[in-house]
């Protein structure tokens, strides 16, 4: 599986992970937590409530929120504020995966982020090293910003 995009099944698993009390709802605090982990949390809880219009989301609303807020109608990635400069949005996404801030994404960092996002089993099963190698055009064993940007823009 390629980590260059989040599928609907991935979102369903995220929802299930976020829904700690298994009531079928994700609260705004839980939504802010995942947005923060993805590097897209730029709103206060009150601002997010104004955007969402309620205190919690069911699965369908969660999926709709993701697709409306994170993806445009053509499916291209954008951040919550729909910044005009794609590099800024891509840099924020890159920084989610560049855990140690050295400017490179390693297989270990990819695995760590997947686990933080609730994909513990998948992180163990997926070959994160292979995923890095697929996008590592300069063959240094890491994905740098330009390689990440190229991956994002050509998904």
Curated annotation (Swiss-Prot):
Pfam families the record matches: EF-hand_1 (PF00036), EF-hand_7 (PF13499)
Binding site for Ca(2+) 1: 19, 21, 23, 30
Membrane-spanning intervals of the chain: none
Database matches in Gene3D superfamilies: EF-hand
Keywords recorded for this protein, A-Z: Calcium, Metal-binding, Repeat
Residues involved in Ca(2+) 2 binding: 98, 100, 102, 104, 109
Domain EF-hand residue range list: 6-41, 85-120, 130-155
InterPro entries: EF-hand-dom_pair (IPR011992), EF_Hand_1_Ca_BS (IPR018247), EF_hand_dom (IPR002048), EF_hand_pair_protein_CML-like (IPR039647)
UniProt-recorded Gene Ontology molecular function terms: calcium ion binding
GO biological process, one term: cellular response to hypoxia
Keyword Calcium carried by entry: yes
Top-rank lineage group of the source organism: Eukaryota
Function text: Potential calcium sensor.
Record-given protein name: Probable calcium-binding protein CML44
The organism of origin for this protein: Arabidopsis thaliana
């Amino acid at each position: 599986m390629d980590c260059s995009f989040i599928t609907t099944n991935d979102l369903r698993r995220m929802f299930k992970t976020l829904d700690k009390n298994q009531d079928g709802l994700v609260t705004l605090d839980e939504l802010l937590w995942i947005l923060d982990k993805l590097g897209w949390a730029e709103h206060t809880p009150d601002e997010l409530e104004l955007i969402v219009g309620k205190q919690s989301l069911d699965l369908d609303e969660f999926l709709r929120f993701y697709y409306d807020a994170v993806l445009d109608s053509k499916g291209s990635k954008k951040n919550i504020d729909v910044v005009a400069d794609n590099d800024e949005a891509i840099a924020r996404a890159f920084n989610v995966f560049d855990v140690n801030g050295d400017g490179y994404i390693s297989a270990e960092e990819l695995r760590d982020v997947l686990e933080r996002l609730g994909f513990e089993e998948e992180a163990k099963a997926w070959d994160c090293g292979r995923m890095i190698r697929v996008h590592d055009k300069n063959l240094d064993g890491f994905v740098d910003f330009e390689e990440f940007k190229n991956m994002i823009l050509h998904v």
